[in-house]
Amino acid sequence: AYHETFEGTYIVARETGNKAALSTYVNNSAVIGSSYDAIKVVKMVGHLPFFAGLKGDKALVIGFGIGVTSSAIASHTQIKRIDCIELVDGLKDVAHYYKGLNADIQYDPRVNIIAGDGRHFLLNTREKYHLISSDPTHPVLGSGNLYTRDYFELCKQRLAPGGMVSQYLPLHKLRQQDFSGIIKTFHSVFPDATVWL
């Protein structure tokens, strides 16, 4: 599937050499695929807060993508509402290609998909969330402002009492000092944070 929109060009294609696996590209950069390695990570981002004892029923997902993280969060029945922010609005329209992985989450009545920038949303909303799951694209693909102290502070301001932030951070294509710097920055805002690899 090929689509051009104001936000950019996005493509869903079969992975070379693996007819069963799909990849989604935004502006010619692979952002997510259906391979086991890709999916286990985004599912983990959604599930870990619950394993850590998350209480509450309202979640915010920054980076809806193909909906797998949102689907993982929705699988926990305590969740009554999930607001999902996605910069490339059209991605929700191709999420159905991944329905075996996301349980058609885009049609779940608890889910509200909002087109826009995650940081801008946090600046302008007054909502408080029990979980903020930040699952942006790789920082080298233009989402670097979603890995900064300013962004983490915004997340903290939008947490309900006892709330948690789950932050995706890739290991690939990231220099050691950049990876360490992001971890230190996150930990400076959330001193009780744990890192899962």
Predicted regions located by residue number:
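A general structural signal for short secondary-structure junctions and capping/turn motifs
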Residues: Y2-E4, A13-E15, A52, I73-A74, ...
